[in-house]
Amino acid sequence: MHNLRIVFAGTPDFAAKHLQALLNANLQVVAVYTQPDRPAGRGNKLTPSPVKILAVEHNIPVFQPENFKSAEAQQELAALKPDLMVVVAYGLLLPQQVLDTPRLGCINVHGSLLPGWRGAAPIQRAIWAGDPETGITIMQMDAGLDTGDMLHKMVCPITPEDTSASLYEKLAIDGPEGMLFTIQQIADGTAKPEKQNNELATYAKKLSKEEACINWQQDAAFIERCIRAFNPWPVSYFKLADLNIKVWKAEVLPNTAQQSPGMIIQASKAGLDIATGNGMLRIKQLQLPGKKAMSFADVLNARQDLFLQGNILP
């Protein structure tokens, strides 16, 4: 395993944790691929990815092609003579020629129990759908979207309190463990690929800011799941008096009186109670424009005028 020439491809912090695990295990990472530096922050300053920052700290050569379609990018990879490519949240499609370049192929760490939630937002969609569990799948990559043979799975329960942020943290522990286990099996020749059942496939489409706008006609339970799924991005919100108010935390209560969806039933230090299509949502933490996220009790002290009982939110 320690003789394998590994190329790592990844971009966000989730991927950086996997690169760190490879380094901690003293594996031979001969190069890192990550997305080009992007503008970030208020100054729109070009910012390197977490994976690039870690690679530079460890003096690992970094490559940042815009895509892998060019012959130059493909030749650069081939010149590294990789045995294995490990891909974690890289964000670029890999053509077949790239997948065929490493002697042992390319493996991917995916944040779901495949074939469920193939695609861009598996962790968020698992919460959004109310799944009781998710996990990590290590797969041998092919040209399809998360369709490759499965090499290893690890199951992770989803608690009623989990947000996408907290679930990411859990899977960022399981993922590196599963990755190292799989690399060892590949090195030993003991990996047992398992085909995916395409009939059971579901797709985790990207999240959008438009999707994060709360529709009070929907069930309180579904809205509450969206709030957790869209934390930390794009963050659920509702409109009130020309303000977009972000919602960070809520709970579901029964709505026995059956008021109109969107009606403010009461505003108290316990929270902001709003009728929905089924049940009542109590908002516990929200964020006014230009302010920090605060408990509703603190917001109420400053802006009681916004949350008048009987008002109906759009």
UniProtKB/Swiss-Prot annotation:
One of its GO terms (molecular function) is methionyl-tRNA formyltransferase activity. Keywords: Protein biosynthesis, Transferase. The keyword DNA-binding does not apply. InterPro entries: Fmt, Formyl_trans_C, Formyl_trans_C_sf, Formyl_transf_N, Formyl_transf_N_sf, Formyl_transferase-like_C_sf, GART_AS, Met-tRNA-FMT_C. Its EC number is 2.1.2.9. (6S)-5,6,7,8-tetrahydrofolate binds at S112, L113, L114, P115. GO terms for cellular component: cytosol. It catalyses: L-methionyl-tRNA(fMet) + (6R)-10-formyltetrahydrofolate = N-formyl-L-methionyl-tRNA(fMet) + (6S)-5,6,7,8-tetrahydrofolate + H(+). It is an enzyme of class 2 (transferase). HAMAP family: Formyl_trans (MF_00182). Belongs to the Fmt family. Attaches a formyl group to the free amino group of methionyl-tRNA(fMet). The formyl group appears to play a dual role in the initiator identity of N-formylmethionyl-tRNA by promoting its recognition by IF2 and preventing the misappropriation of this tRNA by the elongation apparatus. PANTHER family: METHIONYL-TRNA FORMYLTRANSFERASE (PTHR11138), METHIONYL-TRNA FORMYLTRANSFERASE, MITOCHONDRIAL (PTHR11138:SF5). This is Methionyl-tRNA formyltransferase. It comes from Tolumonas auensis (strain DSM 9187 / NBRC 110442 / TA 4). The gene is fmt.
